[in-house]
Amino acid sequence: MELKVINQQGQAVESLQAAETLFGREYNEALVHQVVTAYLANARAGNRAQKDRSEINKSTKKPFRQKGTGRARAGRASSPLWRGGGKVFPNSPDENFSHKVNRKMFRAGMAAILSELLRSDRLVIIDDIKVDSPKTKEFAAKAKALGLENALVITGELDENLYLSSRNLSNVLVIEASQADPYSLVRFDKVVVTRDAVKQFEEQWA
């Protein structure tokens, strides 16, 4: 299939032959949801922690005698029933949040996302995008001219000037093709991909 390629001024300059399997796939919402949630789950650090009753720093002495007080019996102050006591099922930093997605499903999910972006006019193919110096003002002007208010920019290889000039913009993210992930693709309003990045996508996922 043919993709329209624009230049940095937003003008159509040529067409690019691209794989139908990558940009012409039907949208599979369940698969895309699975791929995105698996990516987010695998990115979790797993650093939350709570204490159980054995880890609470309280006396192990019985708070009061077993009978004769009229109160419910109690064994120790670290009981989960008491304020300040341990959790019954505490969260652990060793908890495993990872979801397994095999390579075939991941490739199909990425292709479904790219195809849907193209159908909904959210995917822009550009011949190349560069800035002369690492200045946010220069990149912001270029992004505004291309209508990129909330955009993911994917290049074949990361240009240092482009990266440095864009990292101060909260609504724009510049990455190289090898760093592309399903969450970033669905998160932004526009996805700008260079010709070189398209070729890399075809090698990885087509």
UniProtKB/Swiss-Prot annotation:
Record field: compositional bias (Basic and acidic residues): 49-58
Pfam families: Ribosomal_L4 (PF00573)
SUPFAM superfamilies: Ribosomal protein L4 (SSF52166)
Region (Disordered) residue spans: 47-94
GO biological process terms held by the UniProt record: translation
Gene Ontology MF, one: structural constituent of ribosome
Biased segments, Basic residues type: 59-74
Keyword Isomerase among UniProt keywords: no
Recorded family membership: Belongs to the universal ribosomal protein uL4 family.
Function of the molecule: One of the primary rRNA binding proteins, this protein initially binds near the 5'-end of the 23S rRNA. It is important during the early stages of 50S assembly. It makes multiple contacts with different domains of the 23S rRNA in the assembled 50S subunit and ribosome.
Known partners and oligomeric status: Part of the 50S ribosomal subunit.
Identification of the protein by name: Large ribosomal subunit protein uL4
Organism: Laribacter hongkongensis (strain HLHK9)
